[in-house]
């Protein structure tokens, strides 16, 4: 269980917080704040981002629009299930959840309502926090239709690429999902999007660790990858 950690400090168990089970897409995690007062997480994060910018460091926000913390059809109801389950989630013909995320549910990203939610969220982080870009977790889900089938020209990806407010931020796709859709080198978006290249990462890391048998794959990954594959 990724939420548990057996390590202890002074007998107290430490708990991991990966931030990948989103409840509020517009809200920073309050557990990271230093202040004792409530509602300081936004102020502290803005201060951190400004300090990084002042030192020439860009801030790329890792966003997870492929699923939520509400789990599968037997999971808790926090928000979207109660608002309109049929709109916000991809449902099978028998009313269960498609699970292309590996987390129990899959956001219905190309429904107009969900598209608008994602667009407004990215605009919010761009305008209010001045982040420099976004890395989209399991981004192939962003290109699936309401029935789960891959789309050639997904409306959401096109909308984000063409939006004037997002025109100066980086858009980086982790171009696969847990449903087997692997799109590194063929992500269905314009040159506006870069791709997260998992093969490059894995093969080069393996080679640097001393796995000489992986030298060819590491060399191929370096020489064959284009500059838009991060």
Name the predicted role of every residue range:
Residues 1-130, 135-162, 181:
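Substrate-binding/active-site clefts of carbohydrate-active enzymes
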Residues 130, 143-147, 151-230:
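Conserved alpha/beta catalytic core and glycan-binding cleft of carbohydrate-active enzymes
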């Amino acid at each position: 269980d990724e939420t548990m950690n057996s390590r202890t400090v002074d007998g107290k168990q430490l708990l991991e917080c990966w931030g990948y089970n989103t409840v509020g897409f517009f809200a920073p995690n309050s557990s990271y704040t230093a202040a004792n007062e409530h509602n300081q997480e936004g102020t502290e994060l803005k201060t951190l981002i400004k300090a990084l910018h002042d030192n020439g460091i860009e801030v790329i926000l890792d966003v997870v629009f492929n699923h939520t913390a509400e789990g599968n059809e037997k999971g808790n109801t926090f928000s979207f299930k109660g608002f309109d389950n049929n709109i916000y989630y991809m449902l099978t013909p028998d009313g269960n959840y498609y699970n292309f995320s590996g987390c129990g549910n899959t956001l219905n990203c190309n429904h107009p309502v969900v598209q608008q939610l994602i667009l407004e969220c990215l605009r919010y982080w761009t305008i209010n926090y001045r982040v420099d870009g976004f890395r989209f977790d399991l981004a192939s889900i962003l290109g699936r239709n309401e029935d789960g089938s891959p789309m050639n020209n997904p409306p959401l990806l096109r909308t984000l690429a063409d939006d004037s407010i997002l025109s100066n931020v980086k858009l980086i796709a982790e171009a696969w999902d847990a449903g087997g859709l692997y799109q590194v080198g063929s992500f269905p978006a314009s040159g506006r999007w870069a791709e997260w290249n998992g093969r490059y990462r894995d093969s080069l890391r393996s080679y640097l660790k001393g796995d000489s048998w992986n030298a060819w794959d590491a060399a191929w990954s370096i020489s064959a990858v284009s500059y838009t594959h991060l």
